[in-house]
């Protein structure tokens, strides 16, 4: 039977960073008249995200056996991710998005035991133009019109909502609540900022396997555990 062993840090933790800043400005106006309480307002939301993810950034070696490892034979496979710059220092992609919203709702006390709430929210998310176009990718998928710096277009989200509160017995011992509506959340920021970091413009990954001759560079004294040493051996 085969035995599989891993030694060292996992391939996904090195270089991880997640930093998000959110600023929200809200202004509401409420007006009560008769059985109605009307609320209207506007909201501005800013989200900025910095992300670091270098899968296999600390180097990854796969050997056919323990004997191959201790005898310094060439590995079966190797991978490393590094920055696309001369000093190979990790870069942390950043992206910022904004969203503009307006909304209005009415709380109508139709009966002392029954309240109906209904409203409408309009949201316009705006995404920036990314500076991460991979020219080779653009040329390869020119027919489809795909580019690594594409972001979602600014579409208006229309979200109607309605809900009710029913005091069945009139003594608040049995209350039935319900509602429905359209609720649009934000796109996960990590998806957007990863488009910057993983487009092969900020960082790149080298993967060697099979009969790739460069694997022989890691035979003998070619095996290293420090990242500068690994990159020096590779390049």
How would you label these PLM feature ranges?
Residues 40-46, 118-124, 178-182:
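Transmembrane beta-barrel strands of outer-membrane/channel proteins
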Residues 30-33, 44, 104, 108-110, ...:
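Residue-level signature of outer-membrane beta-barrel architecture
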Residues 104-133, 235:
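A generic structured-segment signal
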Residues 24-26, 101-107, 117, 159-161, ...:
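Membrane-embedded beta-strand positions in outer-membrane beta-barrel channels/transporters
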Residues 131-159, 163-235:
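Solvent-exposed loop/turn elements at secondary-structure boundaries
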Residues 36-38, 114-116, 172-174:
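Repeated loop/turn-to-beta-strand initiation elements of outer-membrane beta-barrel proteins
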């Amino acid at each position: 039977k085969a035995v599989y062993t891993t030694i060292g840090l996992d391939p996904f933790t090195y270089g991880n960073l997640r930093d998000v800043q959110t600023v929200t400005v809200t202004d509401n106006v409420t007006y009560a008249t008769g059985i109605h309480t009307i609320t209207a307002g506007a909201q501005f939301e800013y989200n900025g995200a910095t992300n670091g993810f270098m899968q296999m950034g600390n180097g990854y070696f796969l050997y056919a056996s323990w004997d191959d490892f201790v005898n310094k034979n060439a590995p079966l496979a190797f991978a490393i991710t590094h920055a696309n710059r001369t000093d190979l220092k990790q870069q942390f992609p950043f992206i910022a998005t904004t969203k503009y919203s307006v909304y209005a709702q009415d709380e109508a006390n139709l009966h002392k035991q029954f309240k109906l709430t209904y409203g409408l929210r309009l949201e316009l998310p705006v995404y920036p133009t990314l500076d991460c176009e991979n020219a080779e990718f653009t040329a390869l998928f020119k027919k489809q019109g795909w580019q690594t710096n594409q972001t979602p277009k600014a579409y208006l989200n229309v979200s109607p909502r309605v809900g009710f509160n029913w005091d069945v017995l009139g003594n608040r011992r049995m209350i039935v609540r319900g509602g429905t509506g359209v609720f649009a959340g934000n796109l996960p920021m990590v998806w957007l900022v990863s488009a910057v970091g993983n487009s092969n413009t900020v960082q790149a990954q080298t993967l060697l396997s099979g009969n790739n001759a460069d694997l022989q560079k890691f035979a003998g004294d070619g095996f290293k555990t420090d990242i500068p040493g690994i990159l020096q051996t590779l390049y």
